[in-house]
Amino acid sequence: MGSELETAMETLINVFHAHSGKEGDKYKLSKKELKDLLQTELSSFLDVQKDADAVDKIMKELDENGDGEVDFQEFVVLVAALTVACNNFFWENS
């Protein structure tokens, strides 16, 4: 059994690949796949977003190379940003 961090990394990889490739490139998330992933894995984050275009905005921000899809590296940027925000929130309120 790996460390907590190794397990977290494996989970991140598995979550990405569980949602990618249903509509094309198996190494990227389409807009629909990203939306499904966010609804499944980060539903409380989406619930807080009152903006109906939240997924479109997230997709636009993440898609650094402009190909209309989110690759693993671009996805990790989202997870890292959310993790930093959560860290700041939880440590400031503890």
Swiss-Prot record:
Its main location: cytoplasm. The keyword Mitochondrion applies. One of its GO terms (cellular component) is sarcoplasmic reticulum. Keywords: Calcium, Cytoplasm, Metal-binding, Mitochondrion, Repeat, S-nitrosylation, Sarcoplasmic reticulum. It comes from the Eukaryota. Residues 13-48, 50-85 form the EF-hand domain. It is found in: Cytoplasm; Sarcoplasmic reticulum; Mitochondrion. InterPro entries: EF-hand-dom_pair, EF_Hand_1_Ca_BS, EF_hand_dom, S100-A1, S100/CaBP7/8-like_CS, S100_Ca-bd_sub. One of its GO terms (biological process) is negative regulation of transcription by RNA polymerase II. Ca(2+) 2 binds at residues 63, 65, 67, 69, 74. Although predominant among the water-soluble brain proteins, S100 is also found in a variety of other tissues. One of its GO terms (molecular function) is calcium-dependent protein binding. The modification S-nitrosocysteine is found at residue 86. The keyword Transferase does not apply. Glutathionylated; glutathionylation increases affinity to calcium about 10-fold. Ca(2+) 1 binds at residues 28, 33. Gene3D superfamilies: EF-hand (1.10.238.10). Able to bind zinc in vitro; the binding sites are different from the calcium binding sites. The physiological relevance of zinc binding is unclear. Physiological concentrations of potassium antagonize the binding of both divalent cations, especially affecting the high-affinity calcium-binding sites. Dimer of either two alpha chains, or two beta chains, or one alpha and one beta chain. Also forms heterodimers with S100P. Interacts with AGER. Interacts with CAPZA1. Interacts with FKBP4. Interacts with RYR1 and RYR2. Interacts with CACYBP in a calcium-dependent manner. Interacts with PPP5C (via TPR repeats); the interaction is calcium-dependent and modulates PPP5C activity. Interacts with ATP2A2 and PLN in a Ca(2+)-dependent manner. Interacts with mitochondrial F1-ATPase subunits ATP5F1A and ATP5F1B; these interactions increase F1-ATPase activity. Small calcium binding protein that plays important roles in several biological processes such as Ca(2+) homeostasis, chondrocyte biology and cardiomyocyte regulation. In response to an increase in intracellular Ca(2+) levels, binds calcium which triggers conformational changes. These changes allow interactions with specific target proteins and modulate their activity. This is Protein S100-A1. The gene is S100a1.
